[in-house]
């Protein structure tokens, strides 16, 4: 199928928009794939229509009907609660197992996960050991429901290539893969294309995120990830890196999803979709 272009409904969070707003925009720009963030429980802001997250307590049949009526498929559910370390053990496992169930009900083939912040009081080998245990439990559900669990570079551990290879290599499991992120890897100080190649064996999807000049000057090499960027794809300092990654994906006949992440102003979405389609020659 090749590269499947979609976008993340979370783009509407900064706009106080709803999941329905994201659906309408995807239809407007002829995108067939949408990614959505999840919450555990009821978030009143979402229910009032001012946040695009989906509660895993929602009626999945109703959501699936909305997507089907608009010709959309969920590419991934973005659970993104820190699953690394003790925090993941206490709170993350039970959440991810239920997101896996919800993903299956919605027809989403993947669930995204992230690491925690740096834990200076916990040696890295201990963090790895605990995290392996956490994913071991999650993967039991992933196997039963045939859902791919993605690990996204978003923090100090996922930005550490050696740590990532130890974690992924421990399992060598087709149900544990990587959701790449062009913006986070740039902020971490990586050359996104080089880090993409380093993890390429495991990558099944990618967030496409540019970075504005001011944010890059303030955060690059100091932070490990950003939620969103105010600039459209192609208008930030990460544009050349994104182009290189996309062209490399195309050259390598990548078969998977790429999901636009930018603040969802009308102009940003329009420009981002057009820029990526131009790069890919679509």
Predicted feature locations:
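Histidine-acidic metal/acid-base catalytic patches
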Residues: 1-33, 68-70, 107, 158-282
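Short glycine-centered, acidic/aromatic-flanked micro-motifs in structured strand/loop junctions
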Residues: 9, 79-81, 115, 151-153, ...
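The substrate-binding groove and active-site-proximal loops of carbohydrate-active enzymes
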Residues: 11, 50-54, 81-89, 231-236
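Active-site acidic/histidine proton-transfer and metal-coordination neighborhood
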Residues: 21-24, 60-70, 83-178, 239-243
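Conserved beta-strand positions in the central sheet of alpha/beta enzyme cores
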Residues: 35, 76-78, 112, 150, ...
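Glycine-rich, proline-tolerant flexible connector loops at the mouths of alpha/beta enzymes
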Residues: 35-62, 118-122
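Flexible loop residues that form catalytic
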Residues: 39, 82, 116, 211, ...
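Short low-complexity, flexible loop/linker segments enriched in glycine and/or proline
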Residues: 48-52, 90-92, 126-128, 165-167, ...
């Amino acid at each position: 199928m090749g590269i499947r272009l979609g976008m993340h409904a979370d783009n509407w969070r900064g706009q106080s928009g709803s999941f329905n707003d994201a659906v309408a925009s995807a239809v407007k720009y002829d995108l067939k794939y949408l990614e959505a963030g999840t919450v555990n429980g009821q978030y009143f802001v979402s229910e009032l229509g001012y946040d695009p997250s989906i509660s895993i307590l929602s009626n999945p049949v109703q959501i699936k009907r909305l997507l089907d009526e608009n010709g959309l498929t969920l590419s991934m559910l973005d659970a993104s609660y820190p699953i690394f370390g003790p925090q993941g053990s206490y709170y993350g496992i039970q959440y991810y197992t239920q997101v896996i169930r919800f993903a299956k009900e919605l027809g989403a083939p993947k669930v995204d996960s992230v690491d925690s912040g740096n834990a200076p009081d916990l040696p890295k080998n201990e963090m790895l050991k605990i995290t392996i245990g956490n994913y071991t439990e999650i993967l039991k559900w992933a196997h039963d429901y045939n859902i791919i669990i993605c690990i996204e570079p978003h923090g100090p551990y996922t930005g550490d290539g050696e740590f990532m290879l130890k974690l992924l290599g421990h399992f060598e499991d087709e149900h544990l893969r990587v959701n790449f992120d062009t913006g986070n890897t740039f902020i971490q100080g990586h050359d996104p294309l080089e880090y993409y190649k380093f993890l390429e064996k495991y990558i099944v999807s990618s967030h496409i995120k540019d970075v504005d000049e001011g944010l890059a000057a303030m955060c690059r090499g100091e932070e490990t990830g950003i939620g969103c960027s105010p600039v459209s794809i192609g208008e930030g300092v990460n544009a050349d890196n994104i182009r290189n990654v996309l062209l490399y994906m195309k050259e390598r006949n990548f078969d998977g999803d790429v999901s636009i992440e930018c603040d969802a102003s009308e102009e940003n979405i329009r420009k981002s979709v057009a820029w990526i389609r131009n790069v890919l020659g679509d």
